[in-house]
């Protein structure tokens, strides 16, 4: 436990854990030994229930299964041993299918927990490494930066303005200031200011800490058992499926009760009617619906992870299909976040000059004293550091690591042949950059004198300046005319899409010397333009939010294909809004603005909150991207919060619903497509299950009402249930995303799953199935007596209908011939397995006795195939008619329009 280290000094802590406060652990053998002793740095989940126990519980959890058991027992009492064995076998099969479904659902959900491994920065043998947090051991030296999640209990050994949010552990909302000073022992958790606790979040500053407890030995580990006992809430879709299941169950039970009563009054065998009634209840009630929904959602999430979009919460999958506004950061999401200085301006120049593309700039190329002063300020006001190339996780060839702007500036300094000045200038203090401040400043010591350096947005830097230096480094008073000249050059550079960074230095922080401007290029990501236009075609607005100047933002938005007019004045007036302008708007004006504005410039994370709230008040379903600590509230407020996997802080990732592992906007399009596709698949298998349920109930009901003998026996009905709830239904949930899915507008937030159109399709399919099946039954029963052959033909007819109906339900709008009949591998296996099972039921002697069937000829099979394929052909005609009438928007039409 970490409590003993409160009173230890830094030196005592290092001595006790045999580590070094600067170099960390140095022996790989010792790290391995400590890992064996203390185990991985994760929280162990309690042992799960034995699979055998889980399986046996299936027999008692469903009242209908218990009723079937009772029916089997009554059959034994009456001497009908064959019937009793048949029913018992059917129970085992039904329960096994249900168990496999639930087990698969649990395993799929479990796999989701492993999608987001957590990493941390650790110093070992004096070198910084980026490792999986679970591999930390006591004694490791961990680097903490703003936005990090603390990976273990740490004794702080170095802190610079370090503040940590401990609300998830202590309940206190205000971040706690941390220091390295030893404190008295036996104090409360909230007063332990030299310990950073596992799972808490760095809100401000930076520091280092030595691991003093890992895994279950941490303070967070002590409360983990309580967290384990909390059951995860179901998603809205799962709840609606539960409600739908209950409603259908009630309707089915009423219908079944009527069927059984009619049978009794007609003088049919009461035990047979009871068994058929219970079997119908098992078949008609879609108890597998919520499970298949869960499996479909979970497998869809796993599929998204392969496309670099990690969904952290299942309900988000449902929301993705409803998103109609995406608010995206510019840097790193719409652009590459690989920044390069391409232009430099210093006072006295007529215009900024462009840097050549060569790696090293010749000394003769404009190497003035003014540029050297600007480069010195940019390099000193900089937190980039040399990157450990052995670190494979960061996946970069750049020799520097840090914020992209810092890296661009230090690389520019290197290109001019300047050595890193931070080795000779000793930093005294730092004011970190934030999106609210829009600047960073440092105080340094050099030759016993103190100097201040500043970099940031031009307006912030200029407001702190009283002087400027010319190209020769000579200092002059900053006049209004020179300010205007600086701002004109900033505007011209920004108009070409460059991010502008101003630099200054001086002794007095309120009277700094302005040195110049750096124009930094951050090119758009590949495929972003196509993604933006594709989303807009599908009814999704794309809004760009950036801290850049409005001129830079407009230029970038236009290059990305957003709906921005070519005239800059009109674009700025009607399609762009700055953070300052946004603050001046009342709620009504803000709602009007967000309904038309495409670009928000010079914004802060607080502005993001206002934008989300205004859009939601208009009824929009909003996705918002973010990567910083202060973005977290907006990410939580948005319907879909999207964090960056590479550049994003742990705080942002904790608040987000989705994480982009490649930070690319194009990945959002893939996720929205997948979300819509998953919802389509859910509608398709609901259509399949409902049409089969309605057909089975209607078949028995019509037979009872018209006094026919039962066309299906209890065992056959249970077999149909296995097919309806089993592999064919599940295989519909993994159908590939339809390429036309983005042509459909976003789904309204509260739109019911069972629409009028879906219900019409269900009733049409059920009508065809029931009509043809009754015709087959009546044709076979010409002598008035029901034989094994009659029920076999009827039973096989219904099963074939199931298979063709499943094939038709693979897509609501697209022909199966365009999809490719064999394009869904799981569907092929499911249908193939079902047909093999049906062949065994009809032709294998042991199963013939159980299901009361007999072999039928090839001619019979061909006739049945011809009859049952009607459900597919009718659905194909329906799809063709909708396409012919232009009721279906397709991607091919979109591409033709844009040729």
Swiss-Prot record:
Subcellular location: Endoplasmic reticulum membrane
PROSITE patterns for this protein: ATPASE_E1_E2 (PS00154)
Main location: endoplasmic reticulum
Catalyses which reaction(s): Ca(2+)(in) + ATP + H2O = Ca(2+)(out) + ADP + phosphate + H(+)
Keywords carried by this UniProt record: ATP-binding, Calcium, Calcium transport, Endoplasmic reticulum, Ion transport, Manganese, Membrane, Nucleotide-binding, Phosphoprotein, Translocase, Transmembrane, Transmembrane helix, Transport
Residues bearing PTM Phosphoserine: 892
Membrane topology, from the record: Multi-pass membrane protein
Entry's transmembrane regions: 59-79, 80-100, 247-267, 282-302, 688-708, 757-777, 827-847, 854-874
One GO term describing the cellular component: plasma membrane
Name this polypeptide is given: Calcium-transporting ATPase 1
Family (UniProt): Belongs to the cation transport ATPase (P-type) (TC 3.A.3) family.
Source superkingdom: Eukaryota
Function text: Transports calcium and manganese ions into the cell. Regulates cell morphogenesis through control of manganese and calcium homeostasis.
Enzyme Commission number(s) of this protein: 7.2.2.10
Keyword Transport in record: yes
Catalytic residue positions: 329
Main enzyme class: translocase
MF-aspect GO terms: ABC-type manganese transporter activity; ATP binding; ATP hydrolysis activity; calcium ion binding; P-type calcium transporter activity
GO biological process: calcium ion transmembrane transport; intracellular calcium ion homeostasis; manganese ion transmembrane transport; manganese ion transport; release of sequestered calcium ion into cytosol by Golgi
């Amino acid at each position: 436990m970490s409590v003993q280290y409160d009173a230890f000094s830094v030196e005592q802590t290092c001595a006790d854990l045999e580590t070094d406060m600067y170099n960390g652990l140095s022996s790989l053998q010792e790290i391995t030994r400590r890992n064996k002793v203390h185990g991985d740095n994760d929280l162990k989940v309690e042992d799960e229930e034995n699979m055998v126990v889980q399986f046996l519980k299936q027999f008692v959890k469903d009242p209908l299964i218990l009723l079937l058991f009772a029916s089997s027992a009554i059959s034994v009492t009456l001497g009908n041993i064959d019937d009793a064995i048949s029913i018992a076998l059917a129970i085992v099969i039904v329960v096994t299918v249900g168990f496999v479904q639930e087990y698969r659902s649990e395993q799929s959900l479990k796999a989701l927990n492993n999608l987001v491994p957590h990493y941390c920065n650790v110093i070992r043998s004096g070198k910084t490494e980026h490792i999986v947090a679970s591999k930390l051991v006591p004694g490791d030296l961990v680097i903490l930066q703003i936005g990090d999640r603390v990976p273990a209990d740490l004794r702080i050994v170095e802190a610079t303005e370090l503040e940590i949010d401990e609300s998830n552990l202590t309940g206190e909302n205000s971040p706690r200031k941390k220091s390295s000073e030893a404190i008295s022992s036996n104090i409360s958790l909230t007063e332990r200011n030299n310990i950073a606790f596992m799972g808490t979040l760095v809100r401000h500053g930076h520091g280092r800490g030595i691991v003093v407890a890992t895994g279950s030995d941490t303070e967070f580990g002590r409360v983990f058992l309580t967290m384990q006992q909390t059951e995860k809430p179901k998603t809205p879709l799962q709840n609606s499926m539960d409600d739908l299941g209950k409603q259908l169950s009630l309707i089915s039970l009423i219908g079944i009760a009527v069927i059984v009563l009619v049978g009794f009054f007609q003088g049919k065998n009461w035990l047979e009617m009871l068994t058929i009634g219970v079997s119908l209840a098992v078949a008609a009630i879609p108890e597998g619906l919520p499970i298949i929904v869960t499996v479909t959602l979970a497998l869809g999430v796993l599929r998204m992870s392969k496309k670099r979009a990690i969904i952290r919460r299942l309900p988000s999958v449902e929301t993705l299909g409803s998103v109609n506004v995406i608010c995206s950061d510019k840097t790193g999401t719409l652009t590459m976040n690989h920044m390069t200085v391409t232009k430099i301006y210093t006072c006295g120049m007529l215009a900024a000059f462009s840097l050549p593309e060569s790696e090293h700039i010749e000394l003769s190329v404009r190497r003035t004293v003014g540029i050297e002063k600007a480069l010195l300020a940019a390099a000193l006001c900089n937190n980039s550091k040399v990157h450990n190339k052995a670190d494979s996780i960061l996946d970069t060839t750049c020799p520097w690591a840090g914020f992209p702007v810092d890296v661009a500036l230090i690389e520019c300094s290197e290109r001019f042949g300047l050595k890193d000045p931070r080795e000779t200038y000793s930093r005294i203090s730092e004011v970190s950059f934030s999106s609210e401040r829009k600047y960073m400043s440092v105080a340094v010591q050099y030759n016993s004198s103190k100097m201040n350096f500043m970099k940031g947005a031009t307006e912030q830097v200029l407001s702190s300046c009283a002087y400027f230096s010319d190209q020769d480094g000579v200092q002059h008073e900053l006049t209004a005319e020179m300010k205007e000249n600086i701002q004109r050059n900033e505007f011209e550079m920004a108009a070409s899409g460059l991010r502008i960074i101003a630099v200054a230095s001086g002794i007095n922080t309120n009277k700094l010397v302005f040195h110049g401007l750096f124009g930094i290029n951050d090119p758009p990501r590949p495929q972003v333009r196509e993604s933006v236009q594709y989303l807009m075609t599908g009814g999704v607005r794309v809004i760009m939010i950036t801290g850049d100047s409005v001129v830079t933002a407009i230029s970038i938005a236009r290059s990305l294909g957003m709906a921005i007019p070519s005239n800059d004045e009109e674009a700025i007036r009607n399609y762009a809004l700055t953070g300052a302008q946004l603050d001046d708007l009342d709620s009504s004006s803000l709602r009007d603005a967000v309904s038309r504005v495409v670009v928000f410039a010079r914004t802060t994370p607080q502005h993001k909150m206002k934008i989300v709230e205004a859009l939601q008040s208009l009824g929009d379903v909003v996705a918002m991207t973010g990567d910083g600590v202060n973005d977290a509230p907006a990410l939580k407020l948005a319907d879909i919060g999207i964090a960056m996997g590479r550049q994003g802080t742990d705080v942002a990732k904790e608040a987000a619903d989705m994480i982009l592992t490649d930070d690319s906007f194009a990945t959002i399009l893939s996720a929205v497509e997948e979300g819509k596709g998953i919802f389509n698949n859910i509608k398709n298998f609901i259509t399949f299950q409902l049409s089969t349920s309605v057909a089975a109930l209607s078949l028995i009901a019509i037979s009872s009402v018209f006094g026919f003998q039962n066309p299906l026996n209890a065992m056959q009905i249970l077999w149909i249930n296995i097919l309806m709830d089993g592999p064919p239904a599940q295989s519909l949930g993994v159908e590939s995303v339809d390429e036309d899915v983005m042509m459909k507008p976003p789904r309204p937030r509260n739109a019911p799953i069972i629409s009028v159109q879906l219900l019409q399709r269900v009733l049409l399919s059920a009508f065809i199935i029931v009509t043809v099946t009754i015709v087959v039954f009546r044709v076979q029963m010409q002598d008035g007596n029901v034989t094994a052959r009659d029920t076999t033909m009827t039973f096989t007819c219904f099963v074939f209908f199931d298979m063709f109906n499943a094939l038709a339900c693979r897509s609501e709008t697209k022909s199966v011939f365009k999809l490719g009949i064999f394009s869904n591998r799981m569907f092929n296996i499911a249908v193939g397995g079902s047909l093999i099972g049906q062949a065994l039921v009809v032709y294998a002697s042991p199963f013939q006795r159980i299901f009361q069937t007999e072999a039928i000829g090839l001619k019979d099979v061909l006739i049945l195939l011809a009859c049952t394929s009607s459900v597919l052909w009718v659905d194909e005609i329906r799809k063709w008619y909708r396409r012919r009438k232009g009721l279906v928007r397709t991607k091919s039409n979109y591409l033709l329009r844009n040729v």
